[in-house]
Protein backbone atom coordinates (compact mmCIF):
# COMPACT_ATOMS: atom_id res chain seq x y z
CA UNK A 1 0.00 0.00 0.00
CA UNK A 2 1.46 3.32 -1.06
CA UNK A 3 0.78 6.71 0.48
CA UNK A 4 0.03 8.11 -2.97
CA UNK A 5 -2.81 5.60 -3.37
CA UNK A 6 -4.13 6.44 0.08
CA UNK A 7 -4.25 10.16 -0.69
CA UNK A 8 -6.86 9.53 -3.39
CA UNK A 9 -9.25 7.88 -0.90
CA UNK A 10 -11.86 9.70 1.17
CA UNK A 11 -11.64 10.07 4.95
CA UNK A 12 -14.38 7.45 5.42
CA UNK A 13 -12.49 4.95 3.29
CA UNK A 14 -9.28 5.66 5.20
CA UNK A 15 -11.02 5.12 8.53
CA UNK A 16 -12.43 1.81 7.29
CA UNK A 17 -8.96 0.79 6.10
CA UNK A 18 -7.52 1.73 9.49
CA UNK A 19 -10.07 -0.43 11.32
CA UNK A 20 -9.26 -3.37 9.03
CA UNK A 21 -5.53 -2.95 9.57
CA UNK A 22 -5.91 -2.74 13.35
CA UNK A 23 -7.90 -5.98 13.30
CA UNK A 24 -5.22 -7.61 11.17
CA UNK A 25 -2.53 -6.39 13.57
CA UNK A 26 -4.41 -7.92 16.49
CA UNK A 27 -4.66 -11.28 14.71
CA UNK A 28 -0.95 -11.22 13.90
CA UNK A 29 -0.04 -10.40 17.50
CA UNK A 30 -2.12 -13.33 18.74
CA UNK A 31 -0.45 -15.64 16.23
CA UNK A 32 2.96 -14.39 17.35
CA UNK A 33 2.11 -14.98 21.00
CA UNK A 34 0.99 -18.55 20.33
CA UNK A 35 3.93 -19.28 18.03
CA UNK A 36 1.78 -19.83 14.94
CA UNK A 37 3.06 -16.92 12.85
CA UNK A 38 5.47 -18.17 10.20
CA UNK A 39 5.85 -14.98 8.16
CA UNK A 40 7.04 -12.52 10.77
CA UNK A 41 7.50 -9.72 8.24
CA UNK A 42 3.72 -9.32 8.05
CA UNK A 43 3.57 -7.71 11.51
CA UNK A 44 6.08 -5.05 10.45
CA UNK A 45 4.28 -4.47 7.16
CA UNK A 46 0.88 -3.99 8.83
CA UNK A 47 2.38 -1.67 11.45
CA UNK A 48 3.83 0.54 8.71
CA UNK A 49 0.58 0.49 6.73
CA UNK A 50 -1.24 1.72 9.85
CA UNK A 51 1.28 4.54 10.15
CA UNK A 52 0.76 5.47 6.49
CA UNK A 53 -3.02 5.63 6.89
CA UNK A 54 -2.73 7.72 10.05
CA UNK A 55 -0.31 10.09 8.33
CA UNK A 56 -2.68 10.64 5.40
CA UNK A 57 -5.61 11.16 7.80
CA UNK A 58 -3.60 13.81 9.63
CA UNK A 59 -2.75 15.51 6.33
CA UNK A 60 -6.41 15.57 5.34
CA UNK A 61 -7.42 16.97 8.74
CA UNK A 62 -5.07 19.91 8.16
CA UNK A 63 -6.65 20.83 4.84
From Swiss-Prot:
Q: Name one GO cellular component term.
A: cytosolic large ribosomal subunit
- Entry-linked PROSITE patterns: RIBOSOMAL_L29
Please give one Gene Ontology molecular function term for this protein. Answer: structural constituent of ribosome
Under the heading InterPro entries, the entry gives: Ribosomal_protein_uL29 (IPR050063), Ribosomal_uL29 (IPR001854), Ribosomal_uL29_CS (IPR018254), Ribosomal_uL29_sf (IPR036049)
Q: Which UniProt keywords apply?
A: Ribonucleoprotein, Ribosomal protein
Q: GO biological process annotations for this chain's record?
A: translation
Concerning Gene3D superfamilies, the annotation shows:
1.10.287.310
| Similarity field | Belongs to the universal ribosomal protein uL29 family.
NCBIfam families the record matches: L29
Q: What is this protein called?
A: Large ribosomal subunit protein uL29
Report the source organism.
Answer: Haemophilus influenzae (strain ATCC 51907 / DSM 11121 / KW20 / Rd)
Amino acid sequence: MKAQDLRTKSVEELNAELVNLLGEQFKLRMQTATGQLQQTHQAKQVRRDIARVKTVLTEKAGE
